[in-house]
Amino acid sequence: MKLENTLFTLGALGSISAALVIPNLENAADHHELINKEDHHERPRKVEFTKDDDEEPSDSEDKEHGKFHKKGRKGQDKESPEFNGKRASGSHGSAHEGGKGMKPKHESSNDDDNDDKKKKPHHKGGCHENKVEEKKMKGKKVKGKKHHEKTLEKGRHHNRLAPLVSTAQFNPDAISKIIPNRYIIVFKRGAPQEEIDFHKENVQQAQLQSVENLSAEDAFFISTKDTSLSTSEAGGIQDSFNIDNLFSGYIGYFTQEIVDLIRQNPLVDFVERDSIVEATEFDTQNSAPWGLARISHRERLNLGSFNKYLYDDDAGRGVTSYVIDTGVNINHKDFEKRAIWGKTIPLNDEDLDGNGHGTHCAGTIASKHYGVAKNANVVAVKVLRSNGSGTMSDVVKGVEYAAKAHQKEAQEKKKGFKGSTANMSLGGGKSPALDLAVNAAVEVGIHFAVAAGNENQDACNTSPASADKAITVGASTLSDDRAYFSNWGKCVDVFAPGLNILSTYIGSDDATATLSGTSMASPHVAGLLTYFLSLQPGSDSEFFELGQDSLTPQQLKKKLIHYSTKDILFDIPEDTPNVLIYNGGGQDLSAFWNDTKKSHSSGFKQELNMDEFIGSKTDLIFDQVRDILDKLNII
């Protein structure tokens, strides 16, 4: 099956190198997009955006507000549904692509009612006022017409298309991952809900009418017959999302004609082609859980410390951590009944982790033996199928679920609830929709960790690593090197252990596995966010602003980064922060809560007991052993 939209893979593995730079996405509709419509299915297309607020309609456009005509091949006007409706603030714009675009007609006068009526086309579907009633009688269609003039704000025009974005436009390898005719539509922040509902209703009607003229063998129906993704062969809106009115939109299958019209609506920020998200294989081998030990020591590990995790045994209590992944083996003994199933997003999939990746990540966050915060609650949010694949839109829906579940728990104000964290060890090509979803989830209060990716490239080229409000995590090794696969760059915030990490797995209630990747590094940070949240001082302490109940994600992100160990890692590019996370070593955290000036370096000193003193003297031997093991590819 040929697929059409953006690639996503689990952060533990290799994925596609692709960048998409969109200036000022919050006002993406204010940028002009140049797209070669004729060949957009055959090869990636270059999209350019230029600020042009004063652009006037072209000479080829008639001037009559809110009316759209599509020229047929023989020059006749083909009627098209209108999406703006009388509640919209402006009329639609030109959609000229390859000479076949939809043309808006702008009113030249509002005074001559008779002339105006002569100019008005009859619309098929579209809005309530211009609805065409169709009846089938004896195999023939009889069309009734009901037409009312629309009221649009005088003098305002929507002359530019909302951007159509796709990683495949910038990386040919991603074309095979695009899902044909399936799109994620994102509204501008603050778009009125009444107008959104009106727009969606019209889109649904127009899509149903759009497929009436298609033959049963049309390629559109090939994509919509995939019952693992589609709920209707006719297509249309399948699902919607809304995170506290900060990030909203809908998902569905649409013909090209309807996509063109959707992009003309002033409510729409951008349209993104949906795509397949995949997990690839990863190495499994026996190893010790050195990662926990590393984040609890500032100095380099030695034979006396490499397997010692220093922590507060109350860490994690009162915090809920959402694992947005392949699911979680919630019956694993190491979760001690603190793990529950939240939601399965993929259509017709089962409530279990048939892959293992999500269970492994959850174990690093909160399991008894392998977790950073050993008392936290875990919620499984399945966005990838048991075979390790899913869609970008399902990932967006998973983020929405976590955000709403957090808001509900926070509003209930249950005794002992201290906040929510989330981990998403996914990575792939740039997706504005996913980045905005993650940022919106952070804005409503979730402390978010995401994997930097495993392509040894600039993390800013991938999503959700480029979501600026999350904490983006690169992977380090036992020898304090940047892992050879780990992405880098200014979008990386911190590093955490990510090579040969032992954690919980699937197959039984006590299964374990050792995996590698930034997918394994990110849960260390999600666990550490959970750790600090659970141990935060009371709201009446000096650490909080007056009236504040808990640290905001922005505040905790800043403190976590500042408290981390600086300049201790090797092979870190110049534009990449040399920062390794640190949990405080199980000691008093007053320095963490108070610390706003002092930077912590690898020269941190503390009083050593006898065991630690002896261990420190073995550093040289340990380094030599490590070099030998490194050469044998054992570590």
Swiss-Prot record:
Residues 20-280, 575-635 form a propeptide. Residues 35-50, 74-85, 94-109, 126-136 have a biased composition (Basic and acidic residues). Belongs to the peptidase S8 family. SUPFAM superfamilies: Protease propeptides/inhibitors (SSF54897), Subtilisin-like (SSF52743). GO terms for cellular component: extracellular space; fungal-type vacuole; fungal-type vacuole lumen. Residues 1-19 form the signal peptide. This is Cerevisin. [beta] is the prion form of PrB. In contrast to other prions, [beta] is not the result of a conformational change of the cellular PrB, but distinguishes itself by autoactivation in trans. Usually, PrB is already involved in its own maturation, but PrA plays a critical role. PrpA mutants lack PrB. However, in growth conditions that favor PRB1 expression, PrB activity persists in PrA mutants due to autocleavage of PrB in trans. This condition is stably transmitted to daughter cells in mitosis. [beta] can be cured by growing in PRB1-repressing conditions. Present with 1600 molecules/cell in log phase SD medium. It is found in: Vacuole. Its EC number is 3.4.21.48. Pfam families: Inhibitor_I9, Peptidase_S8. Disulfide bonds join C460-C491. PANTHER family: CEREVISIN-RELATED, PEPTIDASE S8. It comes from Saccharomyces cerevisiae (strain ATCC 204508 / S288c). The keyword Disulfide bond applies.
